[in-house]
């Protein structure tokens, strides 16, 4: 599984260079745009993502949260699986390229594969990358975060108490900019 993630990560870093830096930084931009990457397939994950997004937005960041701001389900109804994949991929890549920051939630037995690709695209396009982790499974097994993922982050917020993680991020945002 780790090999697959590493291969996916490397392939999409290379592919992201093919997209180029189509979304060059606009001069005079006053709001920092954040692309939120992470698992979003269970209700608990979606609720957590919304809570963390609210914290970022309370600090005046403009957040693209795929589960909230991405392609609406209704627009995908008449599409083939290939068309759905293409639309979702292109929308997310476009939003990453328009963002200044990629904020990646690493919780899960392994980091979400799609979010790893999003991180790789962001990193390859000089986006500032931050991670957040509350999941204890890898710590209990004495496993380190994959260096290819960890190496992308300016900072990794890690606290196995979810509320304390929010407090840590809130303190950081009160004193620093992403």
PLM-predicted stretches and their roles:
Residues 7-8, 123:
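Composition-driven detection of intrinsically disordered, low-complexity segments
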Residues 1-4:
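Positively charged n-region of N-terminal signal peptides that target proteins for export
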Residues 6-7, 154:
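General helical structural elements
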Residues 8-16:
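Bacterial N-terminal signal peptides
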Residues 20-178:
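Conserved catalytic or regulatory cores that recognize and/or transform ribose-phosphate-containing ligands
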